[in-house]
Amino acid sequence: MFWKWCFRLSIVFVGLWLLLDLSSRLGAEVFWFREVGYLQVFLLRLVSRGVLWVVAAGVTAVYLWGNLALAQRLKYPRSLKIAEVRREEAELSVGLKNFLSPQYSRLNAPKINDAGHLKPFRLRWLLPLAFVFSLLAGLILVHYGKIALAYWYPAFNKNSLPIITPFRLETIWELGRQVFSQVLYLGLIVGIAIAILIYSQFFLRAIAVVLSVVFGTILFYNWAKVLQYFFPTPFNSTEPLFGKDISFYIFSLPLWELLELWLMGMFLYGFIAVTLTYLLSADSLSQGIFPGFSPQQQRHLYGMGGLLMLMVAFSYWLSRYELVYSPRGVSYGASYTDVVVQLPIYNILCVLGLAIAFYLLWRTIFWRAKSQYRQFVFYGLGAYLFVVVAAGSVLPTIVQYLIVQPNELQREQTYIQRTIALTRQAFGLETIDARTFNPQGDLTTAAIQANDLTIRNIRLWDQRPLLETNRQLQQFRPYYRFPDADIDRYTLEAEAAANRPASANQSPAPAEIAATERRQVLIAARELDYSAVPEQAQTWINQHLIYTHGYGFTMSPVNTVGPGGLPEYFVKDIAGSNEGALSTSSEAVRDSIPIGQPRIYYGEITNTYVMTGTRVRELDYPSGSDNAYNSYSGLGGIVIGSGWRKGLFAMYLKDWQMLFTRDFLPETKVLFRRNVKSRIQAIAPFLKFDSDPYLVSADGSPAFSGRDNYLYWMVDAYTTSDRYPYSDPDNNGINYIRNSVKIVIDAYNGSVKFYIADPTDPIIATWSAIFPGMFQPLSDMPVTLRSHIRYPLDYFAIQSERLMTYHMTDTQVFYNREDQWQIPNEIYGSESRPVEPYYLITSLPTVPFEEFILLLPYTPKQRTNLIAWLAARSDGENYGKLLLYNFPKERLVYGTEQIEARINQDPVISQQISLWNRQGSRAIQGNLLVIPIEQSLLYVEPIYLEATQNSLPTLVRVVVAYENRIVMAQTLEQALQAIFQPEVTPAPAIIRPFEEGTTPDS
């Protein structure tokens, strides 16, 4: 009795704990979303998820438990079974008592069948049949359980998880093969099957409960697909096979596939569970015989079988549309075999499945125990399975190998063209402006001076060496860290931009110069990394009350070098002359770049939650041998206030010291979810986000509140899909992507705003309809921030990867892969690696002004010469435009690998690099940049020197290559001067004829 009460109290305690935990999560989320201004977004998602879970779990539970309860009523009672079988056994001879004996005749079977009963099953048939059905039940549980676990522990956005293939007749074998190839799953499924055979009633009901939770979970996490279905936006473009608008495949088909996944599993398990209930009734296994299905049992199974066949027909109806994702042919999407053979087969299977389903349901409604057409059901199902196997799998394979492959190009030409066209549409490649670029090799010193802005922005400092230098010179304390350095451009007053001449022989500046100039810079945030705090100092107060924020940033021009080969800084240090402000290189920089009080409460590595406005002052920044302290006065955070809120957040954060600390005040706030990625992920989980948030120093008013705070994070967000018809997916399974959203996060206040960057994207239009007011037009972004938007690296990388194949628009060239491209390699440090896209300020060919672009060169497959380069524009009206410059194929244009080889083969350069590498240091070859200037290409590579003991990279040399000339000098200016200096032609020798026989005297 005592233990029973202990068990009950434990159950009550666990239930109360779960209830409190759920309530605290819900309450904290409501407070947090209200703080960031997106409470309506959260509530709509919450209601949608809750309704979907309740509907899916409830319908599944009612259907499965209801049918299992009905089966319990209709199954053979134990007493009837024992009496009948034992009476018949008593009449048998001793030699016939073994039901497995081949001498046992059917005439000796139990006489309990009336005219409506089906024939009995003996043990040699009953046991394998029951075991196979039990294995199927275990396979269903494991399969759908794996899907649910994939949603619980995703590696990417939950809403973007693909719908895994449901239980279709032709795929059960493949699913079984995959699962049974793994010993763990094999043992689990066999164990479930044996448990069902022994304790059928308990385990069949338990599996029904688990599947109800699983199906509820699957629909819970697919709330985005459901909402998109009800708010579709037309693409105004049709796919060629069925003539449907693309929106059907993006918004409608995923929901139908989700329903198929759910209902197919529910109906299939229900049919299997009820069949097992009947087969295992009356202790049939221990008695060695099943008396046969009674008329009531048959009627029940007919009804459930009819629903199952209805889903099978629906599955084949969906399979027709899924042919546009077929990988069978030479190109992605429906191929010749799919259209000519597979599509008619799916149509036939759909119609036959409907016919069988309607017949079974008609027999269920208008039941007759004695029917002369009863055997037609088995014939029909047998014929259906034959068509599925023979026509659904064998026939398409025969056609593919015997008809298509011998004449593949002729058969597949139309379908290849579809793949090319729709892949280019899906990845935004059809709008690329392709031009011819024919390098002339006539670049002169005058041309270099005419392109002074381009030269002044050639990037000599890469992110890696600059970050290493920052960590040595600008961190100041162990708990500060520079997690990243980002390329951007700023408009500076001319005084700030004119610290260094572009070349040694540059003419003096004219009397009238431009008031401002754009400079390419590397900006890095100085964030607080609490994990770097000494272990002895990692106390609760330090973690949550004192070490709350980072401070400041560094800004370095990309092309200038300070004393000793170290980078120069426009902005650096902490605690300048203006009470905690940062140090600047000049007044012009201070006037050009707003600094204010650059506290970073929200950043890339701010992963701890903190409490502000307490009795404990926050560490602001180090000042000499002491520290400066401050209290947060921003708009972020949630007021803890009363005791119940303190308890709520203590429960939510699992931080019980919050309940007992005496440092809280009535105005104390809690700031959590401070990492910018997790912050925007929580608000908009239906978007994908760029991997590189970048810091911007600008005046964001009036869109962002807050005085004297000018630091913002900008993040690019993408709308993606894997359901675009005929579009060949990339390595991540994405076959549609748009950079539709720009996100701005206030680094001090935590405010988040979403701006639509591509209003032509139907997916973002759908999300705008679902969440009205969440997205703002890009024109609402402050101009000071808008001037810093850039073409995102991740988006450009995906497009450039697809372009390597899908620049070929001719079907025969595409089929033969005659013009396949690749991304060239470069040497970085001492290792070869693919060239990464890089930003630069330059003027594109035929464009009369400089602009901020993202560039990537291409080489032909398995060759090293340049074949093209892709440029993405980032400024003003030209933002988002792609330009592809193709080089003449009949002319050699040096690629990065060829230039690297020439650098390493040059005796002077290679000797110097080898000398550095032998003196306790290491020479690092930086990024090799291919820079278009007018109608020529200039190659620039910095060389850094790094000590093996102390990693402080310094820029020691710059290598410049142009045409057949290559120069290594201490500065870019010297290298340019050397490579473009006029070649001195020696004076011809004076040759006089010497006449034989003459002498000076003569």
Swiss-Prot record:
Location of this chain's protein in the cell: Cell membrane
Pfam families linked: UPF0182
Protein origin, superkingdom: Bacteria
Membrane topology: Multi-pass membrane protein
Keyword vocabulary terms for this entry: Cell membrane, Membrane, Transmembrane, Transmembrane helix
Family: Belongs to the UPF0182 family.
Protein's UniProt keywords contain Membrane: yes
Name of the protein described by the UniProt record: UPF0182 protein alr1037
Transmembrane feature ranges: 7-29, 49-71, 123-145, 178-200, 202-224, 258-280, 300-319, 339-361, 382-404
GO CC terms in record: extracellular region; plasma membrane
PANTHER family xrefs: UPF0182 PROTEIN SLL1060
Main localization (coarse): membrane
